[in-house]
């Protein structure tokens, strides 16, 4: 398997070009799944307060035998704790649950714009970074206007914006904007599992043309777009397969064919960040 390339974030932190999503990996089975992911070669694990698995992530880190400094560990602040003091306490408690001294990256999970607290939360995380509790501060599901407001009021853009992105929802405008302001795009649900995109005839045909599985084809598409995909799997074989995307490449025509699958109804659920709220 080829070595995993790295991205350098706008704050100088180096991160691998693909990470292991951990949604629904909880408890002792979740620990085993995360350990198998690390053994497969993943060096970045993406968890969240709302996933209820920060403790499992910490246990996996202690069990895996890989030095802490070689890993990039991530969690997220829930929408119900966006006031300054609440954000700080939630972060501190998450570190206690995981048994960690710091998060490599800590993200605001949703902007929840009706509440109007995401800038306050972002400032709290910047201050926590100054205390050494976080190395990099990012966000999820932010629109350009949310990113601009954060920058205007704090003087900084987030290091990453983790958004829904897959062939049926390619988010070209968001990618272009993120590139303009120096924010790395992370892709959640990169395979669009609700839509079963790996079974799309166009994807199946392209995968056969390239000589790879449909999931590897899609994840390679993400990488060549310049994003960081976060495939989630607890299956060791699937984890290894999803990681093996750096030994081949797609032509411009193949990339365009995948992007052309985008649909107006491509979002998997009614979670438009303009109005959607998650607590």
Tell me what each language-model feature is.
Residues 1-71, 277-279:
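N-terminal binding-site loop/beta-alpha segment at the start of enzyme catalytic domains
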Residues 80-122:
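Glycine/small-residue-rich loop that forms an oxyanion/phosphate-binding "nest" at active or ligand-binding sites
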Residues 111-279:
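Beta/alpha (TIM)-barrel catalytic core signal, keyed to glycine-rich beta->alpha loops juxtaposed to Asp/Glu
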Residues 9-10, 58-69, 92-101, 127-129, ...:
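Acidic (Asp/Glu)-rich catalytic clusters
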Residues 42, 100-103, 134, 158:
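A structural motif
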Residues 68-81, 104-111, 141, 165:
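A short, structured active-site edge motif that brings together acidic residues
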Residues 25-28, 47-56, 80-85, 113-116, ...:
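Acidic-and-aromatic substrate-binding clefts and catalytic sites of carbohydrate-active enzymes
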Residues 25-37, 83-98, 145-148, 169-170:
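Short, acidic/polar
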């Amino acid at each position: 398997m080829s070595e995993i390339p790295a991205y350098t974030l706008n704050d100088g932190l180096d991160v691998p070009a693909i990470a292991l999503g951990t949604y629904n990996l909880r408890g002792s089975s979740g620990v085993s799944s995360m350990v198998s992911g690390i053994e497969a070669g993943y060096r970045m694990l993406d968890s969240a307060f709302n996933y209820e698995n920060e403790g499992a992530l910490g246990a996996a880190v202690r069990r895996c035998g890989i030095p802490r400094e070689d890993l990039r560990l991530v969690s997220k602040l829930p929408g119900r704790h966006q006031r300054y003091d609440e954000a700080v306490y939630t972060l501190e408690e998450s570190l206690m649950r995981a048994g960690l001294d710091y998060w490599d990256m800590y993200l605001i999970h949703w902007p929840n714009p009706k509440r109007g607290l995401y800038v306050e939360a972002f400032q709290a995380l910047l201050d926590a970074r100054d205390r050494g509790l976080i190395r990099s501060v990012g966000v999820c599901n932010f629109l350009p206007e949310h990113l601009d407001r954060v920058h205007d009021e704090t003087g900084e853009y987030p290091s990453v914006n983790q958004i829904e992105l897959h062939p049926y929802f390619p988010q070209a405008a968001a990618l272009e904007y993120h590139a303009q302001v120096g924010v790395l795009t992370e892709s959640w649900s990169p395979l669009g599992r609700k839509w079963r995109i790996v079974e799309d005839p166009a994807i199946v045909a392209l995968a056969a043309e390239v000589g790879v599985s449909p999931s590897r084809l899609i994840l390679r598409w993400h990488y060549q777009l310049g994003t960081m995909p976060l495939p989630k799997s607890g299956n060791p074989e699937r984890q290894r397969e999803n990681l093996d995307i750096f030994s081949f490449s797609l032509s411009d025509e193949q990339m365009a064919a995948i992007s052309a699958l985008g649909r107006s109804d491509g979002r998997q659920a009614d979670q438009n960040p303009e109005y959607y709220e998650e607590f």
